[in-house]
Amino acid sequence: MSATLLVPSMTVKAADTIYNNKTGNQDGYDYELWKDTGNTSMTLNAGGTFDCSWSNINNALFRKGKKFDSTQTYQQIGNITFDYGCDYRPNGNSYLCVYGWTVDPLVEYYIVDSWGTWRPPGGTPKGQIQVDGGTYDVYETTRYNAPSIQGDTTFKQYFSVRTSKRTSGTISVSEHFKAWERMGMRCGNFMKPALNIEGYQSSGSASVYKNNMTIGGSSSSSGNQGGNQGGNTGNENAGNNLVTVADADKIQCETMTKSGQYTGNISSPFNGVALYANNDAVKYTQYFASGTHDFTLRGCSNNNKMARVDLKIGGQNKGTFYYGDSYPAEYTIKNVSHGTGNQTIELVVTADDGQWDAYLDYFNNSVEPGCSLVPGAVVVLVALGSSSNTGNNSGTNTQNQKLIALTFDDGPSSTTSQVLDMLEKYNVKATFFLIGQNVNSNTASIVQRQVKMGCELACHSYTHEDMTKMNASQIRNQIDWTASAIKNTAGVDVKFFRPPYISVNNTMYQNIDLPFIQGSMHNDWESSTSASQRVNSVLSSAKDGDIILLHDFQGNSQTVSALPQIIEGLKNQGYTFVTVSELFEMKGVNPNVEYKIWSNVK
């Protein structure tokens, strides 16, 4: 999303007051008053602010926020925050919260900062999270055949309820969604988040004197409320407007230096730059204090043909951004090694065949300490992420070692426990590619044992279906749900992905932000392959840097029986066993290569 103010200039006029059910849009905010019975009033003040009162009601709500069309996840929309202040005076049961819905799955959610006589929703929390400098209890409930945005149906309710009340501050909606997903609570496509006052069989009043909704920009992952508010000081005078992230957080491509015969500005599907032909380019200058970074570009093709934009730093090609259709998306080239000091950075088209154009929107602006604009430079290319040197770690102590990585697919299961027994006996680590739906309360102890033993956990999809038959949203869900299940169970992040059936296509490459891993295969999923055949297959084909693909699905006893001879045989051949992460690190190889699936690292 381009950093564009969504609200037109306003003419000051007397505030409207409504008394009955009504929805509409005012000053860029979507508003709603809803009640089933009783007396209500809602005065629509400027921007996101409003006053409301209620009495003799069964249920009533008053809110201002933003409606979305339910086609994008919160990750695609960007970070959403509410900076609010409210004089809140409930008499009885009431909430002050951010409220909304997601679809696919259908979820009604509440982020509650204050309440009346009853603290919602009752019951036992799933756990606690730290967001915006406060602690929230998290709850998940199910409503059966209840009213929803899709009629009477069954759906989930998610609650984050602050442990201590407050009536002003920042609510970082996206951070709650991230925390919920880490706890295994799936979130779907976004609809109408809003700052909400709700009453139930009660009376009261509220004056929302501040309500700034921000879309896009940097995440408040630190949970520091002060950091959020401080980051918005540039918009203090926009307190009554719906705003997107400040310009300082985005670098718009149309402001950059252009070169080439046809390079030019565009206004659709965003305000940006079009590269129409080979050698069309935009150039940048950046000072780097360290030599490894991630680079992210938002863009798209002008049609359904694959557009390619090369990234050059210091005249050297560092990778390519790929855009497979006309839907704008962010793509990242990770762990790029480059020179330090002043560097010329170029985004350039070199593979144009006359069938597509490349549209460029923006770079995220998150410059690290030690990086700065060069005097006179037109623009900075953003350097995201850490400055680790994992891409250059090969040293004399490892370069002559023969390394091999054992990996196992389709767990966790009871067979996984038997595999772990063998690995523990021989003091060997492995990488396990887990199926997300198999990670549950019955297998949690197995997953935790894997981590305790120093093994690595990776993603093998959530349902183990052929993902080449899925759309982009379904593909991302498979990854996100699995990562959340693993994070919630074992507290670790996944770093690699192995596609089910080793079946891949461009849509998968474009929507999965993890390195793809294959490996050498030994037919150990076939019950007709004997234990000795599995041993011989592995030992006869092993090479330095290999990733060996085996399976720990329920009942795969032949692989368990083969493991002692496989491990002993590889040790006799001089191999050291490492995880997949260690294999890349010790070989000094960057795994983040677009459109590549790895079986050997060298």
From Swiss-Prot:
Task: For this UniProt record, give its keywords in alphabetical order, as a comma-separated list.
Answer: Carbohydrate metabolism, Glycosidase, Hydrolase, Multifunctional enzyme, Polysaccharide degradation, Secreted, Signal, Xylan degradation
Put simply, this protein is called Bifunctional xylanase/deacetylase
Q: Which GO terms describe its cellular component?
A: extracellular region
Q: Which InterPro entries match?
A: CBM6, ConA-like_dom_sf, Galactose-bd-like_sf, GH11/12, GH11_AS_1, GH11_AS_2, GH11_dom, Glyco_hydro/deAcase_b/a-brl
Indicate whether Metal-binding appears among the record's keywords: no
Give the main localization category: secreted
Q: How does activity depend on pH?
A: Optimum pH is 5.6. Active from pH 4.0 to 8.0.
Q: Which family does it belong to?
A: Belongs to the glycosyl hydrolase 11 (cellulase G) family.
Among the GO biological process terms of this entry, one is: xylan catabolic process
Tell me what gene encodes this: xyn11A
Temperature-activity profile: Optimum temperature is 38 degrees Celsius.
Regions of biased composition (Gly residues) lie at 224-233
- Its EC number(s): 3.2.1.8, 3.5.1.-
Residues annotated as the enzyme's active site? E108, E198
Region spans: Disordered: 216-240
Residues in CBM6 domain copies: 249-366
User: How does biotechnology exploit this protein, per its UniProt record?
Assistant: Could be used as a feed additive for animals in order to diminish health problems due to undigested plant fiber and enhance proliferation of beneficial microflora.
What this chain does, per the entry, is described as: Endo-acting xylanase which specifically cleaves internal linkages on the xylan backbone, releasing xylooligosaccharides. Is also probably able, via its C-terminal domain, to remove acetyl groups from acetylated xylan, and thus it is probably capable of hydrolyzing acetylated xylan.
Task: List where in the cell it is found.
Answer: Secreted
Q: How is it modified after translation?
A: In the later growth phases, seems to undergo a proteolytic cleavage into a 30 kDa protein possessing xylanolytic activity.
Give the signal sequence positions.
1-14
Reproduce the free-text note on domains from the UniProt record.
Consists of three domains: two complementary catalytic domains and one substrate-binding module.
